[in-house]
Structures are given as structure tokens and as C-alpha cells.
From Swiss-Prot:
Catalytic activity: propanoate + ATP = propanoyl phosphate + ADP
Name of the gene encoding the protein in the UniProt record: tdcD
Protein name stated in the entry: Propionate kinase
Key words of the record: ATP-binding, Kinase, Magnesium, Metal-binding, Nucleotide-binding, Transferase
InterPro entries xref list: Ac/propionate_kinase, Aliphatic_acid_kin_short-chain, Aliphatic_acid_kinase_CS, ATPase_NBD, Propionate_kinase
GO biological process: one example: acetate metabolic process
Length: 402
């Protein structure tokens, strides 16, 4: 065992590799960065926010070699004891994180058509990392596995049975690593018994989802077979009547591919505001009186509140509502507006606590006492992946959840 073991966490996206290096003993981040623009002339590597390093026309293995070189420069290469990979979709094959083997890779490849943009990139990262670090144990952490505890009535669509039985069409849910991390932190912050508790976690970012967590398990979530369903998001429509899309196709002559692009890339906050998918831009426009920016935010908030209240029906009790993700952690306005919609659930906002910046970390933002506690808990998916790797890799370390 290395005297100073670290975990390398890798998240390969469709055009980028996000990575971080965490101390096994404390889970403190020692190094983090992103290789972006894969397979283009503009590809670059940025570490700890420093000046970008040119990686023109690099593929995933080239980028990981560059990351490994930076590790070596910092005398960290020999300290890499474990590697954790974020995997987008596990189909119905995995209920928890697993040690990566050839068989596991084959199974991930089998379900990759369910998330082709991400899973194949994830596999490229695994293949490259196994070649670069052949002696290091590697772990796959699935974004969907936390939701494998959903009951059939929560994951089935009202479609002919053969679409589920033959094609696997069902709700899978996403942001599972975030929902799992945040719910576990909430038990401590809210002083709850995990086995007798009910939480709603609202992961709000450019992608956004709600999760109902009952007694430590996901029992309902807003995203579906793909990350398109549920809340309105930065550029995604969220829930939309399929009949409306069929009517648009008929009236405009657009193809299925055209409409997939519309609901994934041209809708949501961007589509309604006509201004931006960035909530920070829209909040500024809100205060300047931009009518469609205000309408986009109001629609976003209405969808969040409606899904939070609806997901509460999957719980036996409601102890807390937790905001996380880039918007959930940082937007005072969105939290305020959502909570104003949820008075029916017994929520009362502490206005001053809600105004505290995210640098204050985990914090309760409802008045005391409150029928339902409302809190902000910054997510840390990298730490959750590292903790899973530490646990599965049998590395002894004084860390929570391990």
C-alpha cells in the first residue's frame, strides 16, 4: 500500500474529461481539472484553473496521458491507489458501484445504446485508464444505480408491455450519485434516522432533477429513460405532451431528429426567454424587467415546486427538502420562489439564512421550528465516487460512508 494513497476520479463526457485527485485519508481534493474539446484542434487541458495546456486533436487516451504526466510532475503517479469512473447508465444491470473487470466492461457496453453520447465516452476513459494504470484497481460508479430501488409502479410508463419487456423502455433516473451523497449528508445535518426518514432532494443545475428518498432509498425521481424528462432545464423542455410534438411535426414538417434537437438543445430557459440558458443571465434580466426572462424563471420555478410536491406523495413522511447543484446551491431567488410555492407543505423560509452565500456550506434555510426543514447542501459527486472506490478497494481510511 502506498504511504500516501490517492484516488483518481475520472468523468469522461462526450467531448471532455473532468478529473480530480483526492487524498484517501481525508478526501480533500489535491488536484482537479478538465480536458476539453476532445478530437478537435482546440482541445486543451486546464488544471486547478491554471493556464490551459494545448492538446490539439487529442483523443481520450492522449488526454489521460497528459493528465498522467501532470500527476508525475507533482509526484502523485505512484500514489494512485484507486481510480473511480463515473458511468452514465447501467440499464438494469447494477444496483451499486462495482470493481471493473472485463465482464463488467462487456455489460456496460451492452447497455450503452441507452446513453450513447456518454457511455461510450465513459468506456473510452476506462480503456485508456486501464492501459495507463494497469496495476491500479478501478471502480465504476453509475449515475442511475441509486434509482434501482424504484418500484415498478414508479418506473413503468403507460405503454404496451412489450416496449418494456423487449426494449427496456422505463424510467431509470439520473443524478443518482449526487442524490445519494446529498441525502446522506442531510441525515447528519437534520439529525435524522436514515431508516425512518423522508427527503426530497432537488438537484438544480443546467440539468435538473428531483428525487424522493424514503428510509435511505430512492423511491421516485423526475428524470426518465433519458435526462430529458421532468423539470424544465437550461435547454431541455422537461415534461411535454407528445401530442404537442406530433402536431408540431405535422405543421412544420420537422423530423424526429429535428424535434429531438429542439427539446434537448433549444428549449427550457433558453427557449422561453429567447435570451440565455444561463440562470445568472436571466436573473440579471429579471431584475431589469425583461418580461420573457421573468416568465422563463417563473415557469422553471413552477415545475420545480410541482415536482417536489408530487414526489412527496411517494414518502411516508416528509422531514426535509434539500437544494443542491449549481442553481440550488447558489440562487437565492430560485430557492425563495420555490419555497413560496410550497407553503402547503409547511415550509417557511428564513429570509436571512437563504441569503447566505454558498461559501457557508451546508445550512438550514427554513425558520425554526418548521414542520418541514429546508436546507442547502453542496453536492460532491467526486467525493462520493472516491468513497465508493475506497470502500470497494478495501483501502482503510477514516472517511464517512466508507
Amino acid at each position: 500500500m502506498n504511504e500516501f494513497p490517492v484516488v483518481l476520479v475520472i468523468n469522461c463526457g462526450s467531448s471532455s474529461i473532468k478529473f480530480s485527485v483526492l487524498d484517501v485519508a481525508t478526501c480533500d481534493v489535491l488536484m482537479a481539472g478538465i480536458a476539453d474539446g476532445m478530437n478537435t484542434e482546440n482541445a486543451f487541458l486546464s488544471i486547478n484553473g491554471d493556464k490551459p495546456i494545448n492538446l490539439s486533436h487529442s483523443n481520450y487516451e492522449d488526454a489521460l496521458k497528459a493528465i498522467a504526466f501532470e500527476l508525475e510532475k507533482r509526484d502523485l503517479t505512484d500514489s494512485v491507489a484507486l481510480i473511480g469512473h463515473r458511468i452514465a447508465h447501467d440499464g438494469e444491470l447494477f444496483t451499486q458501484s462495482v470493481i471493473i473487470t472485463d465482464e463488467i466492461i462487456d455489460n456496460i457496453r451492452r447497455v450503452s445504446p441507452l446513453a450513447p453520447l456518454h457511455n461510450y465516452a465513459n468506456l473510452s476513459g476506462i480503456d485508456a485508464a486501464r492501459r495507463l494504470f494497469p496495476a491500479v484497481r478501478q471502480v465504476a460508479v453509475f449515475d442511475t444505480s441509486f434509482h434501482q430501488t424504484l418500484a415498478p409502479e414508479a418506473y413503468l410508463y403507460g405503454l404496451p408491455w412489450e416496449y418494456f419487456s423487449s426494449l427496456g423502455v422505463r424510467r431509470y433516473g439520473f443524478h443518482g450519485t449526487s442524490h445519494r451523497y446529498v441525502s446522506r449528508r442531510a441525515y447528519e445535518l437534520l439529525d435524522l434516522d436514515e431508516k425512518n426518514s423522508g427527503l426530497i432532494v432537488a438537484h438544480l443545475g443546467n440539468g435538473a432533477s428531483i428525487c424522493a428518498v424514503r428510509n435511505g432509498q430512492s423511491v421516485d425521481t423526475s428524470m426518465g429513460m433519458t435526462p430529458l424528462e421532468g423539470l424544465m432545464m437550461g435547454t431541455r423542455s422537461g415534461d411535454v405532451d407528445f401530442g404537442a410534438m406530433a402536431w408540431i411535426a405535422k405543421e412544420t414538417g420537422q423530423t424526429l431528429s429535428d424535434l429531438e434537437r429542439v427539446v434537448n438543445k433549444e428549449s427550457g430557459l433558453l427557449g422561453i426567454s429567447g435570451l440565455s440558458s444561463d440562470l445568472r443571465v436571466l436573473e440579471k434580466a429579471w431584475h431589469e424587467g425583461h418580461e420573457r426572462a421573468r416568465l422563463a424563471i417563473k415557469t422553471f420555478v413552477h415545475r420545480i415546486a410541482r415536482h417536489i410536491a408530487g414526489h412527496a406523495a411517494s414518502l411516508h413522511r416528509l422531514d426535509g427538502i434539500i437544494f443542491t447543484g449549481g442553481i440550488g446551491e447558489n440562487s437565492v431567488l430560485i430557492r425563495q420562489l420555490v419555497i413560496e410555492h410550497l407553503g402547503v407543505l409547511g415550509l417557511t423560509l428564513d429570509v436571512e439564512m437563504n441569503k447566505q452565500p454558498n461559501s457557508h456550506g451546508e445550512r438550514i434555510i427554513s425558520v425554526n421550528p418548521s414542520q418541514v426543514i429546508c436546507a442547502v447542501i453542496p453536492t460532491n459527486e467526486e467525493k462520493m465516487i472516491a468513497l465508493d472506490a475506497i470502500h470497494l478497494g478495501n483501502v482503510k481510511a477514516p472517511v464517512e460512508f466508507a
